[in-house]
Amino acid sequence: MRRPFKTDAPVKDGPRSNREIRIPKVQLIGADGENMGVVPTDQALRMAEEAGLDLVEISPNVEPPVCKILDLGKLKYANQKKAAEARKKQKIVEVKEIKMRPNIDTHDYEVKMKAMGRFFDEGDKVKVTLKFRGREMAHQELGMKLLQQVKADTTEFAKVEAEPKLEGRQMMMVLAPK
């Protein structure tokens, strides 16, 4: 049973620093990157305070833990910048759809292919959908032929992720950039 009004300990993110390091001895790396060997934690804290910096635990899983004398604020700032840069570089792959009919004109086909090329340049996947109307369902081979032509025209910059298949009155194929 929990005690009323007792809050859990706050969850700390980032490495332990200064007084949070409660191990008797640590492997110390100085502010300029030199290895100072195994040092008592009190002495390491004193050295960090004299330098006006913080004692930060770098590798807690080794015996003794590796600590470094550095500016904790600068370390946190650098980590935030690195995380923001990684988030910025992440590209969410979207699936763009190109709709056609089996009896598409050559110029219309070229315009659709140009749009498809633009989508691949942006790193997006393309879903090619062929819609059949009325009696066009009797000539599914024309639709398959058109999708094979799309596949052949995009081989240098795209690969087929999902082969052409018929679902109801639509034939679909998914292409992904190489």
From Swiss-Prot:
Keywords, sorted A to Z: Cytoplasm, Initiation factor, Protein biosynthesis
Region of interest (Disordered), residue spans: 1-20
Top-rank taxon: Bacteria
Chain segments annotated as coiled-coil in the UniProt record: none
Gene Ontology cellular component list: cytosol; membrane
Keyword Protein biosynthesis: yes
GO molecular function: ribosome binding; translation initiation factor activity
Compartment(s): Cytoplasm
InterPro entries named among the record's database cross-references: T_IF-3_C_sf, T_IF-3_N_sf, Translation_initiation_fac_3, Translation_initiation_fac_3_C, Translation_initiation_fac_3_N
GO biological process, one term: ribosome disassembly
Record flagged with keyword Ubl conjugation: no
Function: IF-3 binds to the 30S ribosomal subunit and shifts the equilibrium between 70S ribosomes and their 50S and 30S subunits in favor of the free subunits, thus enhancing the availability of 30S subunits on which protein synthesis initiation begins.
Family according to the record: Belongs to the IF-3 family.
Subunit and partners: Monomer.
HAMAP family named in the record: IF_3
Protein name: Translation initiation factor IF-3
Source organism (scientific name): Rhizobium leguminosarum bv. trifolii (strain WSM2304)
Chain's gene name: infC
